[in-house]
């Protein structure tokens, strides 16, 4: 919603065996300004972040972040470790904030914070929340929410919902090994 304007896009995302993403707009409605100036730029940023070089520099790993355990919490009914994360470099795709790690499966279930580098001069601050859900054997994005405070235009809220996952076992096996090996 921007200037009391709304926009919506339904986008099919495909992720190949290397992790690179492609996007296909299925339908769109609402404000052309919001779709073209905000949503399409977000899609392009996600495509860029999925490319191999950028992906390695933005993974939530000790190579890219410093971690500090701050406590335990229950997230979506599951016991979780809460860690503070601080990026080691300034990168628009890195987040400064907290992560929730499932205490049983050690998967990241939630990320909250702000970008390590401000995405634009025109934006004062951005708060983001990423939520993940288990889909079969995998933890995949379920919802991304962000609130940007712009210098001139005020507050912009964006919500992205992920659903209808189709996982190709052939691609998974090519990246991770045979499925039968996982159960051992």
PLM features: what roles do these ranges have?
Residues 1-96, 103-107, 116-126, 133-140, ...:
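Structured extracytoplasmic
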């Amino acid at each position: 919603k921007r200037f009391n304007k709304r926009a919506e896009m339904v986008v099919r995302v495909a992720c190949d065996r290397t992790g690179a993403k492609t996007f296909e707009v299925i339908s769109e409605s609402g404000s052309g300004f919001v779709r073209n100036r905000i949503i399409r730029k977000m899609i392009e940023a996600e495509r860029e972040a999925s490319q191999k070089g950028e992906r390695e520099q933005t993974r939530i790993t000790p190579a890219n972040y410093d971690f500090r355990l701050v406590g335990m919490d229950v997230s979506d009914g599951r016991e979780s470790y809460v860690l503070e994360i601080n990026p080691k470099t300034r990168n628009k795709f890195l987040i400064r904030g907290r992560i929730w790690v499932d205490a049983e499966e050690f998967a990241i279930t939630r990320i909250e914070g702000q970008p390590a580098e401000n995405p634009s001069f025109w934006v004062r601050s951005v708060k983001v929340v990423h939520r993940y859900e288990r889909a079969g054997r995998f933890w995949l994005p379920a919802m991304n929410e962000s609130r940007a405070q712009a210098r001139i235009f005020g507050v912009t809220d964006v919500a992205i919902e992920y659903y209808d996952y189709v996982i190709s076992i052939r691609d998974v096996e090519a990246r991770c090994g045979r499925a039968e090996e996982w159960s051992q």
